[in-house]
Regions:
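Active-site helix of classical SDR
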Residues: 53, 88, 96
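Active-site loop-to-helix junction immediately N-terminal to the catalytic Tyr of the SDR YXXXK motif
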Residues: 33, 78-86, 98-99
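Substrate-binding pocket helix/loop in short-chain dehydrogenase/reductase
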Residues: 29-42, 139
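A glycine/serine/threonine-rich, flexible loop-to-helix segment
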Residues: 115-142, 153, 183-185
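Residue(s) in the substrate-gating loop at a strand-loop-helix junction
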Residues: 72
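Short, small/polar-rich loop/turn modules that mediate ligand/substrate recognition or access, typified
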Residues: 104-108, 169-171
Length: 185
């Protein structure tokens, strides 16, 4: 990460936005995964986000910038996502809220929490190839908008939270899920 930080600083004179989008959803469905599995998921989803924030925070404090974490609706509600993954994504939201309170007004810290996002090569693409009818039924029964989010919709939300139009927003988690969490929050 320090190598990446050095490259970023040498390329741009001012860095005022850092988006922390790290981790993966690969895990197991066990209620309580093994220690080895837990550590692997925790490290790839939470610890990597924490270390990225820690590495780039001095730059953002200097520029009075924005730190945006990408979490998941799995960090907000139990939807059947793996326990270790959900826990790590919840921890990201808690980290961001605490950082936002302590860093305001110099650095804004927010989170986006996407729901189901479709893109070629993604996990939903593979599931659709296996059983499109089943996936269609899952989406129609769980997402009031009856569709997947697009990567562009997630990107647009990130751009907004990092823009001057969101200058008074810090410590927030923007849920982008087509209404999937409407009845559970």
């Amino acid at each position: 990460l320090n190598n990446l930080k050095g490259k970023v600083e040498s390329r741009w004179s001012v860095v005022d936005i850092v988006i922390v989008n790290v981790g993966d959803g690969r895990s197991v469905s066990d209620a309580l995964p093994s220690d080895e599995q837990w550590k692997s998921t925790w490290n790839s989803n939470f610890e990597s986000a924490l270390q990225t924030a820690r590495t780039f925070l001095p730059i953002l404090e200097e520029s009075q910038g924005v730190l945006l974490f990408v979490s998941s609706i799995a960090g907000i509600e139990a939807f059947g996502a793996p326990t270790d993954y959900s826990t790590a994504k919840t921890a990201i939201i808690a980290l961001a809220k605490n950082m936002a309170r302590k860093l305001a007004p110099s650095v804004r810290v927010n989170v986006i929490a996407p729901g189901n996002v479709y893109f070629k090569g993604g996990s939903w693409d593979g599931k659709i190839k296996q059983d499109k009818k089943d996936v269609d039924e899952i989406i129609k029964s769980t997402v009031p908008m009856n569709r997947f989010a697009t990567p562009q919709e997630i990107a647009d939300s990130a751009v907004f939270l990092c823009s001057d139009r969101a200058n008074f927003i810090t410590g927030a988690t923007l849920v982008i899920d087509g209404g999937q969490t409407v009845g559970v929050l």
